[in-house]
């Protein structure tokens, strides 16, 4: 991906959150990984390539305690990973509007971020972990529901092949 740059942000405990971004125009896409997934898995690679073809920005990161970010995995909780997502969005919020693509646990985090950041105007949730939210899932406001596209089990709008990314 051209124009890719790496970033480091200090988490609330001073440990570094590491990620990568590519600039683009009109829209930015933030990919939030699922539980125990590193930022450059197959989904994020395919999505990054597709964003580049659209001329959109793309960003992905590793939560503290996993991947290339600092810290021990066992020292962090969901609250910490929500804070990591806030830090990344704070870094990027002054650019074009955001679509957050969340995978599994990342969908749960994305849902919270969409409520906190006005720059997030679209969500794509892959196998969202809403069962973790209990009663909160029932309290999703209509305006947030209008942002959400739920995709169960697979990302059907982007198919990664060895030669290209195609829309289906």
Predicted features and spans:
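N-terminal cap/lid segment of alpha/beta-hydrolase-fold proteins
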Residues: 1-24
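Short substrate-entry loop that stabilizes the transition state in hydrolases
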Residues: 36-42
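Short beta-strand element of the alpha/beta-hydrolase
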Residues: 26-34
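The alpha/beta-hydrolase serine catalytic core
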Residues: 108, 118-168
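Gly/Ala-rich beta-loop-alpha elbow adjacent to hydrolase catalytic centers
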Residues: 102-110
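Short beta-strand immediately N-terminal to the catalytic nucleophile in serine-hydrolase-like folds
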Residues: 100-102, 126
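Catalytic nucleophile-loop/oxyanion-hole region of alpha/beta-hydrolase
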Residues: 67-92
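Conserved alpha/beta-hydrolase
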Residues: 44-70
């Amino acid at each position: 991906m051209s124009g890719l740059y790496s970033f480091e942000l200090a988490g609330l405990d001073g440990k570094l959150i590491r990620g990568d971004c590519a600039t683009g125009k009109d829209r930015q896409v933030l990919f939030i990984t699922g539980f125990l997934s590193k930022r450059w898995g197959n989904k994020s690679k395919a999505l990054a390539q597709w964003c580049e073809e659209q001329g959109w920005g793309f960003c992905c990161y590793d939560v503290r305690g996993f991947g290339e970010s600092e810290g021990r995995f066992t020292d962090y909780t969901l609250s910490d990973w929500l804070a990591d997502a806030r830090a990344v969005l704070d870094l990027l919020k002054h650019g074009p509007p955001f679509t957050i693509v969340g995978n599994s646990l990342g969908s749960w985090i994305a849902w919270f971020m969409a409520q906190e950041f006005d720059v997030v105007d679209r969500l794509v949730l892959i196998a969202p972990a809403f069962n973790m939210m209990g009663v909160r899932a029932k309290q999703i406001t209509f305006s947030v529901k209008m942002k959400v596209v739920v995709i169960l089990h697979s990302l059907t709008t982007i198919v990664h092949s060895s030669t290209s990314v195609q829309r289906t």
